[in-house]
Amino acid sequence: MKFAPMDKVKFKTASHLNKLRTLKKRVPELDDPLLGECWEFEEDGLRQFDWEENYEFVARPKHFNWD
């Protein structure tokens, strides 16, 4: 699976990027060098961006405080 470079990943707001950084610290398995540059937030959870396919659901933390 190929991943898009960071400049092609659009976050809805800057706070989403900050939340991703926090999430990666709290959920170590998400802190993968290949995955860390191609995450994007959607309303129903964290999704991984794949240019060859559509959005692919990757992870939705059940007990993560987004505030």
Curated annotation (Swiss-Prot):
Q: What is this protein called?
A: SPbeta prophage-derived uncharacterized protein YoqF
* Species of provenance: Bacillus subtilis (strain 168)
Q: Which gene encodes it?
A: yoqF
